[in-house]
Each structure stands twice: as C-alpha cells, then as structure tokens.
Design a protein with these regions (language model features):
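Elongated, amphipathic alpha-helical interaction scaffolds
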Residues: 1-221
Length: 222
C-alpha cells in the first residue's frame, strides 16, 4: 500500500513539474520571438487527435515569405513544430522520432490532400542542456548533426528540417527568455531577465510572470 502511494506521489510530482515548465516554455517562446510576433501565430498544446496527443507548441508564419529576425527562426518554413523538454526530462532518440511522427500527423490533419506540403514543416527540439547522446545516436543512424551557431544544431537527412536547441549555450543578450528556463538560474541571469522584463508591456509582463513562476517553483523545491 505504501509503495503504491509513493508511486502515485512520484507520478503526481512529475505531472506537476511538467505543468509548470511547459506553459513557461510557451510563454518564453513568445517573448523570444517578440520582434517577429506580427508575422507569427502561436498555438500551445496543438491537438492532433481527439485523444490526448499534443504538440507542445506550433508557430505558423502569417506571411509565408516573411523573414524572421531571431536566429532560431532562420530554419522556419510556414509551419513550425516545437517539442520542449524541461531540465529534468531527457531529450532522447524516442523524443526525436515522436516529433517526426507528430509532424507527419500535422501534415495529414487538414481536410484536403497535401493542404500542408511536407516542405513547409520544420521541427525544433529544445532543452537547456545539449543532448549529446541523442546526437551521437542520430549520427550512428546516418543523420548529420551540424552546429549552425552557438546553441543551435541542424540535423540533416530527416524528411523535415530539424534543429536542436541547447538553451544554456545560447547567447544571453539575444536569448535571455529561453536561457531563463533552467533549474540552475544564476543571479546575474535573473537580474538581466528582470531588467528585460521591466521594459515590457503589461501583456508581455504577464507572459514573463509564467516563466518566473516556473523558475521560482523549481528553485523552492530544490
């Protein structure tokens, strides 16, 4: 009986942590791409099927040929799928194939054949630490993982363009929103984050609050 209760408590704790981090990521992503917000449409937990099968976040370019200023959007096509892993979750080979499967489902979701062309879909996998083991396994499987810029790695040979983002490696001045999604937040980074938030509008500050709540919750439980 005690073992069962302990198991349930652990499952509830994992669920609670996920509920904290994923809304924080979606909010951080909006702030990260704030400069390009007029050209993008965001959907959190995009529902793929009637049963619970969700993409963490989708980002759709309003104008197909618009240029995204933020470097994480360099890879963007029309439809862009994000799969996020919290600091305590592993970004592994199964995550990779799940994201590819989700992209395939997303492609066939509309009512008309080829309404969303495969070449208009990209996948972004993101976690705070570089998933070294995953990238090694991808290389062994015949894919090529190439560093595009600091913290951003492109995976070639996949049916969709794929990038892996290690948010802890990103440039702090350019990507403080995503770098804040960590369970090891340094004081200097927190100060820089709060300084950036102070210049936000009320709506943007509400998004930042979601990020801060997740980070604060994690540090209080550490």
């Amino acid at each position: 009986m005690e073992k069962e209760q302990t198991k349930n408590q652990q499952e509830n704790q994992k669920k609670s942590q996920k509920l904290q981090w994923h809304p924080a990521f979606c909010s951080a992503l909006r702030l990260e791409l704030l400069e390009d917000a007029a050209n993008l449409e965001f959907t959190d937990e995009f529902q793929l099927t009637e049963k619970p099968l969700q993409i963490d976040c989708t980002v759709v370019k309003v104008k197909k040929n618009c240029r995204i200023k933020n470097e994480i959007g360099k890879i963007f096509r029309k439809h862009n799928i994000f799969e996020y892993k919290s600091p305590k979750d592993e970004l592994n080979i199964d995550t990779f194939y799940k994201a590819v499967a989700y992209a395939c489902l997303y492609k066939v979701l509309p009512n008309h054949v080829d309404e969303i062309p495969a070449e208009e879909i990209t996948i972004t996998l993101i976690r705070d630490r570089k998933p070294v083991k995953l990238m090694q396994e991808l290389e062994k499987s015949g894919y090529e993982c190439k560093k595009e810029t600091v913290g951003i790695y492109y995976v070639s040979g996949v049916m969709f363009p794929v990038q892996i983002i290690a948010s802890s490696e990103l440039d702090v001045d350019m990507h403080v929103q995503l770098k804040a999604l960590t369970n090891h937040l340094e004081e200097s980074l927190m100060r820089q984050y709060l300084l950036r938030v102070s210049a936000f509008s009320e709506r943007e500050k509400n998004l930042a609050d979601v990020v801060l709540q997740a980070v604060s919750y994690t540090h209080l439980r550490a």
